[in-house]
């Protein structure tokens, strides 16, 4: 520990701990969980599970990301994209990260058990284990299919939100999980393409490094086609109506256009734009689910 670390202000220390929770990723996950809460009921979500579920899921997600930062601190230090993280820079010790994660995780479990229900607590804990242990420790350093297999834990937020309100997870909730599960590979492979040297330097077996750029571009296109089909399921199942359908078709068509361009004429700039659009895509798609849900409630559909 050097003099710079010792002289840090409380504000900078707080920001370092917040950075461990990967706030932007956490926000998207919690957003999808909250959408799951609202889709689970035709009326307003009761305040207790809404607030308790949101806070509990947020805390456990932050705990999982903190463990991820701890495990990957040496890897992160080798990558331009992640070398700024306080864990990679050695600004927070291993013991501090473990304690921080344990506190967040413990508070999250207590919050979910107390203000939501035991099922949500156990499902969220399983998601924590899936991401922090199975994906981070076992899959990511071992196989280029890490994103495909490990994406199951990252796809769980809508089911967690649904369970927080109703105490069970019906088929409609699993459709939402499936959407995120299929969305995950093209989202991350676009990132892996334009950051492939980063991943190569870190020794991670991401698809562009193990199977080549062309193979990855093809699979981004294939998964985006599958995603387009999967996003029709809420309408086909009757969970959503024409408002959602129109949004899904428009958003999906644009995603397909990006994937097709990547397949035909690749550039790092295009991959970067595709990655960024994929985040906007998922956010707007789930927002469309919510708008459609309450539009149908208002008209009595």
Swiss-Prot record:
Keywords: Cell inner membrane, Cell membrane, Heme biosynthesis, Membrane, Transferase, Transmembrane, Transmembrane helix. The chain crosses the membrane at residues 25-45, 47-67, 97-117, 119-139, 147-167, 173-193, 235-255, 279-299. NCBIfam families: cyoE_ctaB, PRK04375.1-2. One of its GO terms (molecular function) is protoheme IX farnesyltransferase activity. GO terms for biological process: heme O biosynthetic process. Carbon 2 of the heme B porphyrin ring is defined according to the Fischer nomenclature. Converts heme B (protoheme IX) to heme O by substitution of the vinyl group on carbon 2 of heme B porphyrin ring with a hydroxyethyl farnesyl side group. Its EC number is 2.5.1.141. It is an enzyme of class 2 (transferase). This is Protoheme IX farnesyltransferase. Belongs to the UbiA prenyltransferase family. Protoheme IX farnesyltransferase subfamily. Its main location: membrane.
């Amino acid at each position: 520990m050097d003099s710079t670390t010792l002289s840090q202000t409380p504000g900078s220390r707080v920001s370092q701990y917040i950075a461990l929770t990967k706030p932007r990723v956490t926000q998207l996950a919690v957003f999808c969980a909250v959408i799951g809460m609202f889709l689970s009921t035709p009326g307003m979500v009761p305040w207790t599970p809404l607030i308790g579920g949101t806070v509990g899921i947020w805390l456990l997600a932050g705990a999982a990301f903190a463990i991820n930062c701890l495990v990957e601190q040496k890897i992160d230090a080798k990558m331009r994209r992640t070398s700024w993280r306080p864990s990679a820079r050695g600004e927070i010790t291993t013991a501090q990260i473990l304690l921080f994660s344990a506190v967040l995780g413990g508070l999250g479990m207590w919050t979910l058990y107390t203000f939501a229900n035991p099922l949500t607590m156990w499902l969220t804990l399983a998601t924590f284990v899936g991401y922090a242990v199975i994906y981070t420790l076992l899959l990511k350093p071992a196989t280029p299919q890490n994103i495909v297999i490990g994406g199951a834990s990252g796809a769980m937020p809508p089911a967690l939100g649904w369970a927080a309100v109703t105490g069970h997870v019906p088929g409609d909730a699993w459709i939402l999980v499936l959407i995120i599960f299929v969305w995950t590979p093209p989202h991350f492979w676009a990132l892996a393409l334009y950051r492939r040297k980063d991943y190569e330097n870190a020794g991670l077996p991401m698809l562009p490094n193990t199977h080549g750029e062309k193979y990855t571009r093809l699979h981004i296109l294939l998964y985006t086609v599958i995603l387009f089909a999967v996003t029709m399921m809420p309408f086909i199942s009757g969970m959503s109506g024409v408002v959602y359908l129109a949004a899904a078709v428009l958003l999906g068509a644009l995603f397909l256009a990006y994937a097709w361009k990547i397949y035909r004429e690749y550039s790092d700039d295009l991959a970067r734009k595709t990655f960024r659009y994929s985040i906007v895509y998922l956010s707007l798609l789930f927002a469309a689910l919510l708008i459609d849900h309450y539009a149908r409630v208002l008209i009595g559909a």
